[in-house]
Amino acid sequence: LLLMLLTVVTGCSTKSKTQNKSTTNLTTKPTEDTQFLMGTVCTIKIYNKNKSAALDDGFARIKKLADEITVNQKGSEVDKINAEAGKKPVKVSADVYDLCKKAYYYSQNSHESFDMAIGPITSLWRIGFPDAHKPTQKQIDTRLPLVNYLNVKFNDAERTVYLTRKNMKLDLGGIAKGYITDQVKKVLVKDGVTSAIIDLGGNVYVLGPSPTNHSNWTVGIQDPKKSRGTAIGSIPEMNKTIVTSGIYERYLKVGKTIYSHLMDPKTGYPFQNNLMGVSIVTKNLVDGD
């Protein structure tokens, strides 16, 4: 999972070239709610007037997708796929099938740095959970051969997903929050929302203009060396997502070594480098993840 704190301010000195009907009927006092879902804090702020129903629709979409996707939630569709590994294909909803196909695409095109079948390794380390620990090399060597997205098979006609080897596990946490955020954005736009902030545990999308001056939003990037809420810089954006992954919130410390939550599917160990955080700006959050 990609975690960070983004501070979004409703004004920015950078003026938009055009202003249209999306800037009308806005308020600086948003209709908003914050709920704890998917193991993280989720906030939606809508700056259009009279859009409480859209807020409800947005959270309903989060809950539905979380129930289908969460790998650690017994009974979720991804959990069912994992339970039938090496046994039989599992028919899934259109949403889960779409997410799995996207995960396969990114597994193919990430130069082996992302693998949707990383589940046997992430479930071994369990970084981010109270029982996180460094496994033995033997444990890693035993599970590493199971990490291979090429052993995930799809049937478009039947809309099924099949893990061909027993004990394989999907873990879509690397892109799930981004996918869900994109889906929430679609719901809000369909409901006529033109100005909003969607923040799912630090995966942020800024929709439309800021209500303060009908311009870009200012998105602050968390300083990885400072306390939560301290920005190292800011980015002016509109209709974009800003995703930052860092080692400063979810990690395991063993002796003097810090292991991040970002797993290398080639080694079975967390990636080791000198980067404390990386920010990506893109139109679709799933791409940023």
Identify the role of each PLM range:
Residues L1-L2, V9-D289:
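Mature catalytic core of soluble alpha/beta enzymes
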